[in-house]
From Swiss-Prot:
Pathway: Quinol/quinone metabolism; menaquinone biosynthesis. It catalyses: cyclic dehypoxanthinylfutalosinate = 1,4-dihydroxy-6-naphthoate + dihydroxyacetone. One of its GO terms (biological process) is menaquinone biosynthetic process. It comes from Thermus thermophilus (strain ATCC 27634 / DSM 579 / HB8). Pfam families: VitK2_biosynth. Substrate binds at residues 55-57, 107-108. Its EC number is 4.1.99.29. This is 1,4-dihydroxy-6-naphtoate synthase. Catalyzes the conversion of cyclic dehypoxanthine futalosine (cyclic DHFL) into 1,4-dihydroxy-6-naphthoate, a step in the biosynthesis of menaquinone (MK, vitamin K2).
């Protein structure tokens, strides 16, 4: 059987989640071929329907609901997990300022667009944002992934925690990313893949040290301390199953996107 291409990012939470599935520690209903790419690349590919199974920002999912459906397992959603805006010093407002952003299809960018208007986005790969801010190439940066743990090393300060802002505004956890299956795979296979991803998450949680070498191999020279901080922040009970509260959070995010004309309403269910 031809291998199914599975896209996910090289960030520790994704490599932790998929370690067991990729290495045969848990059974998959079909052979899988891992494709590791930056999340914004995966977001753009999803607009083309390129990968049958892929990690995706929830903000991008809102644009591809007719083609993809979210698995209940494997996602990144929670409290205290949000993107941060950082700068070299305190800022009163972002209007008119250049802000380095990790892509216009990311949930982080969507949140920043809700929070502030009039800033000038400068799109770069997420791991270039901190150096750009520190060197004065831009006035502020919108940071995601491990950057939320490393920005003090660059002498930068937090301007706003967009996750905390979302939680205060909605009372809900923040949906960041999900694992999506292309609907043409069929419901039976999609449900089997969902269960396989859930088992992979459970295996990693039960044997965390076993995944460390795989995480290190893709973690862009991060220390073990930062790798584990990343995992403990982004992998949680919502990663095993999005649950009712998670579903409400995603529905709220999509409603915000639809209200601003950033996504079309869809009658399709959000999750398999």
């Amino acid at each position: 059987m031809e291998a199914l291409r599975l896209g996910f990012s090289p960030c520790p939470n994704d490599t932790f989640i998929f370690y067991a599935l990729v290495h045969g520690r848990v059974e998959s209903p079909v052979p899988l071929e891992p494709v590791l790419e930056d999340v914004e690349t995966l977001n753009r590919w999803a607009l083309e329907g390129r990968l049958p199974l892929t990690k995706l920002s929830y903000a991008a999912y809102a644009q591809v609901r007719d083609r993809y459906v979210a698995l209940r397992s494997g996602g990144a959603l929670g409290r205290g997990v949000g993107p941060l805006v950082v700068a070299r010093g305190p800022l009163q407002a972002l209007e008119g300022l250049r802000v380095a952003v990790p892509g216009r299809h990311t949930t982080a960018y969507f949140l920043l667009s809700l929070y502030a208007q009039g800033f000038v986005p400068v799109e770069v790969r997420y791991d270039r944002i901190l150096p750009m801010v520190a060197q004065g190439e831009v006035e502020a940066g919108l940071i995601i992934h491990e950057s939320r743990f490393t920005y003090p090393r660059y002498g930068l300060v937090q301007v706003v925690d967009l996750g905390a802002w979302w939680e205060e505004r909605t009372g809900l956890p923040l949906p960041l990313g999900a694992i999506l299956a292309r609907r043409d795979l069929g419901e039976g296979l999609i449900r089997a893949l969902d269960e396989a991803v859930r088992r992979s998450v459970a295996y990693a949680l039960a044997h965390p040290e076993e995944a460390l070498d795989y995480m290190r191999a893709h973690a862009q020279e991060l220390s073990d301390e930062v790798i584990w901080a990343h995992v403990h922040t982004y992998v949680n009970a919502f990663s095993l199953d999005v649950g009712e509260e998670g579903e409400r959070a995603v529905a709220r995010l999509f409603a915000e996107a639809e209200a601003r004309g950033l996504a079309a309403p869809s009658p399709r269910p959000l999750f398999v």
